[in-house]
Regions:
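Signature of dsDNA virion morphogenesis modules
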Residues: 1-180, 199
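Enriched but not universal
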Residues: 180-199
Length: 199
């Protein structure tokens, strides 16, 4: 397997939702940052789409004891908007994926700004960062299936879900696989040519 253990990876995914609330002061965000068994095109090389799937059950033994909600993975602002450790960030694992609910601090302007940005749909995508424990790769479908996630670090509101850091690790993984596939094709071509010359 070509992935590097303990290397943090980032993925952009589904939109945030502002739930209807009878409490007009509540600043709640909901979303599904991880959707199981759904192929996602991570990149394309030479017209071939390289996909990734997070398998149902991949989070079964995942360390989710302390992950956070932030913005853009804390790159421009280190604000922690919610955290599992203090129960301001809650999650459930369903058949569909990982669902989160974050209770933001209405007294903090940064929290109000994030809530407003999501409410106005200026920010409507999520991303997550994690470390892979186990994965498999299908050379025929060019699909990497993550079967076990070791640790979840954060779920993040992202301004641009396709910004470079979102899939740096995935692109390097798929670039390695693409190079291997090309080398295997070249080796098969040479072998066929040698066999033709021998007979």
């Amino acid at each position: 397997m070509a992935y590097k253990p303990n290397e943090r990876e980032y993925r952009a995914v589904a939109p945030f939702v502002i739930p209807d609330s009878s409490d007009g002061d509540a600043l709640i965000l909901r979303g599904t940052p991880i959707v199981f068994d759904t192929p996602t095109v991570i990149c394309e090389y030479d017209g071939i789409e390289y996909k990734e799937i997070i398998a149902r059950g991949a989070l079964d033994d995942c360390d989710m004891s302390d992950f956070i909600l932030n913005r853009n993975h804390g790159q421009n602002d280190s604000t922690v908007f919610a955290r599992t450790r203090n129960n301001s960030l809650k999650y459930t694992i369903s058949d569909r994926g990982l669902d989160i609910e974050a209770a933001l601090d209405g007294e903090d302007e940064r929290h109000r700004n994030l809530h407003r940005d999501v409410q106005k749909k200026r920010v409507d995508k999520m991303s997550f960062s994690f470390v892979v424990r186990e994965a498999k790769y299908d050379n025929v479908t060019h699909t990497r299936t993550i079967t076990k996630v070791k640790k979840l670090y954060d779920v993040s509101a992202v301004d641009f879900p396709a910004y470079n850091d979102t899939s740096i690790s995935a692109r390097s993984f798929f670039a390695e696989e693409h190079t291997r596939e090309l080398a295997a094709l070249e080796q098969a071509r040479r072998r066929k040519k040698l066999l033709a010359l021998t007979y």
